[in-house]
Amino acid sequence: MGATVVIGGFFGDEGKGKIISYLAQKDNPTIVVRGGAGPNAGHTIKDGDKTFKVRMLPSGFLNKTSRVMIGPGVVVNPDVFLKEINDFATEGRSFLDNNCGIIEQHHLEADSKGRLKEKIGSTGSGTGPANAERAMRTLKMAKDIESLEKYIIDVPQELNSALDKNENILIEGTQGTHLSLWHGTYPFVTTKDVTASGICADVGVGPKRIDDVIVVFKSYLTRVGTGPMTGELSAEETSEKGWEEFGTVTGRLRRAAEFDFELASRAIMLSSANQISITKLDVRFPNCAGAQSFDELDSESKLFIKNIEDKLGVPVTLIGTGAGVNDVIDLRT
């Protein structure tokens, strides 16, 4: 038992929400906590005939026995936070730290026009302007907002107390390594570091308390908005391969390319990842859709997984074979 961190290895949209939801149900953590920048990152979760699109709460909310928390490093839109508590029926087990920054209307307006929108391709969520104001030490905090009062808790204290009791916690990263403010394709990046160390700092858990770092890669590469992307496919090529996707927050068509081993290797290095999760294997290899064991995969998809392990030197432990939360091959021992 201990702390597991899940991060994205590319440019976001790797399928972290699905993997985190699976782990939340399979490993039954006491707490699932979200780090990252803010509501600019969305996770899509399909559970049975229901599809959830989450922007503020951790994706592990489907486990009704887990408490879900937002770390102090995250900026919060109170309207989105409160709506998700209501929509996903998590009242009584949803919390945020009193030091979470607050997104206000003027942040939304600033994020939806000018350079941020036109050149960087911002999501318009207000996250960037709010984090900029936080750096200037003028941002309102969660403790200043009356409607959030009953949800406020000392998140780092809760997490570390749980670890002291040998309980299991799941730390959820957002976006992807190559959108990191420090390590990404600047200036086409987010407003925070979203590697494992950055996410842990966001929630208040020290590096010596982390047992596993799982980096999530999709079986192909996608990116929303502007910024460099090696080997980018045309819209026609993307459609022919069946790789058309749209952003959870923006609704924009995602750009696509082949799996990038150079980016993947650097993501592993930057976060000391000791496990890899590959998602959407079924999109690349339709014959493996719904597979629940490695033996069920065809030779082509097995070779794809083996090639990733051989080139990156890290074991693939979780393989997504469908849209559902439980469409996962779990190779962890």
Where are these predicted regions, by residue range?
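Non-transmembrane, aqueous-exposed alpha-helical and coiled segments at domain scale
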Residues: 1-333
